[in-house]
Each structure stands twice: as C-alpha cells, then as structure tokens.
Amino acid sequence: EKKSELNFDPLTEVNSFEDLRKFPLFEDEWLRGGPVRRWVPKGLENEPTYVFETGGTTGIPKSRVVMRDHWRDYEMFSHTLPDEYFPKGSNWLMLGPSGPRRLRLAVEHLAQYRGGISFCIDLDPRWVVKLIKKGWMEHLEEYKKHCIDQAVTVLTAGHDIKCMFATPKLLDQLCTALEERGTSIKEVGITGIFSGGTEFTPQWTRYCIEELFGGPTEQSGIYMTPTYGNTLMGLACSKPVTAEEKYKISYYAPQPRAVVEVVSFDDHNEVVGYGDTGRVKLTTLTDELFIPGFLERDEGEREEPFETFPWDGVSGVRPFHEIAQSTTVGVY
C-alpha cells in the first residue's frame, strides 16, 4: 500500500543505510487505532503476539505489536550489566508503570533471563497525568504515596531483592520514604539500579549518587545506570557516568537493531556536528518493525563513539524545545 506512494522502488533501490533517507518520515499517529494486525509481518503472523501501548491519557493510544523484540532488547541490555552489582539469580523490583506497557514485561523478562524473579507494583501513569492536568495535587501526592508504599512493602517483605528498575522521580520518593522509616535503599539490600526517564539530568544524577546513595559506587555499593528508550526504539545504554565528566549522560542505541542520529532542526536528513544540538531521529530495523526515520519528541547533543559502543551517541536528552512547554512528564 505504501509502496505505491513512493517515487522509488524500496525492493531494489535500498542497498545501504544512507538509502533509507529516501523514505518519508514515519508518523507515529499511524499507530493509533486498529486493526493492529496490519503491523504484523507476514513471516511472523503465526507467532504469539503482544500489543503494547504508549500515551493514551486522552484519546486513542498508540499501539505497537511485538513478538520477541522486547525479549531480545533486554537480553542484549543484560550483557551490559555488571554482575557484581546485578547478581545473577537475584530478584528484582519493577518500580514503574504497569498495565499495557512494554516496560513491565521487559523488566520481568530481564529478571528471568538473569535467573531471578520480578516483583512489581500497580501504577497507572495515565491517571498521574490526568491528576497533574486537573491540578489535583492532593490526590497526586496520595497516589504517589500509594505507589511508594507498595514498593516499600515488597522491599521489606524478605524477598531478597537486590536489583530494580525505577524512574528518577519514583526512585527519589522511594529513598525518602525508606529514610522516613529509619532505613535506606542500601540497607534494604539494593545493589543495582537501572533507571530511565526525561528527568535524568547530570544535576539529578549527582544529587542521587551523593545524597540518596551516600557516595559513588565504590563507597555506597550501589551501581546505577541510566537508559533511554521507548516502545519503538527498545533500549539505549549509557556510557559510564562519572564525577570526572560532571555526571554527563550519553546514550548509545542498540545498533544495528536501532540507530539514533542527532539531526538539524531544519533538515532531518542532515546530521549535526559532534557537540552540536539537534533533534533525535530514530531508525528501527528489526525483523518485527521497520521504521525508516522517526523524529522523536526529544533533542540533545551529538556524541562521539567510544570503545564499548563504536557509533554515535546523544547526550543532554530533553523534550524538543518547540513542544517542551506542552509536555506533561508524569511519572517519567
């Protein structure tokens, strides 16, 4: 159907990554509504299929069908985690959104892949966004407390949980709640944390390490790694965050499954220079999903490759300046 709209033949005229620029940009609005089976590749139509949603606070949410991509993404991510702080066989807490979201099942698979069991809480991010937009701050505080209480209960129930996922906001609130109860994230046994969300800034990271954890990993015994991802991309890992680099956070996509470029605000096919600012552009190339260029709602600076990830990265990720004021962050 789309092929008939193109001015080139994608079957014969796409021979390199550069050739993907011939395609028009992918529009995520196409993901609203059904039937979702139109997104299932013919070769996978008999595979068990999941559907994950993003957004949906108002109107029809965007949906992505998945067979095994969420497993593969997190298995690859698993191999970047240091076993010293994410011990094989240890249990996990998923302190993030529940419901029709990829993240919950993905973290559960990550725990199982590493030989552990994942515990989770009930958290509806759509309700959080509605509370913020309505200005119901008292209700918002009670709902946050309700979510954190669930996490504290799990962590203090003797489940031998050493690893967890949390968004920055929820991790901050969890540490505060534990402190109010006379304990800490370290004392309840957590040694490894992977986190992600738009609140992940160098300033917050420094505060978290110095104030919430009590010092760097060598001193606190707690290792935290930032991540950047979504339903369409998968998971981008970060370069190790250090005080020497002023807690700068640089993300690297899981090539070749996904490629992140920082492109000019005026020309989405023009990659900016290293250190320059631009919009984040995503290309996804798995056997389940083909996205030949999608402009994320984020901007950042282009980063140089390094030893672990020998391809371009992006730092300073934040909401795209033209829509930043209209973006409600919620639990992320």
Predicted regions and their residues:
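Short, charged/polar "capping" segments at the starts of alpha-helices
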Residues: 1, 101-104, 201-203
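Nucleotide 5′-phosphate-binding alpha/beta core
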Residues: 1-100, 153-156, 331
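Short, compositionally biased "basic patch" segments
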Residues: 43-58, 108-127
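A glycine- and small-aliphatic-rich helix-loop capping segment at beta-alpha/alpha-beta transitions
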Residues: 69-73, 111, 182
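Phosphate/oxyanion-binding active-site loops and adjacent basic polyanion-contact surfaces
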Residues: 69-74, 103, 143-144, 166-167
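Short, well-ordered alpha-helical packing segments
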Residues: 78-82, 108, 175, 209
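Conserved AMP-binding loop of ANL adenylate-forming enzymes
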Residues: 82-124
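Active-site glycine/GP-rich loop and adjacent strand/helix microenvironment
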Residues: 117-332
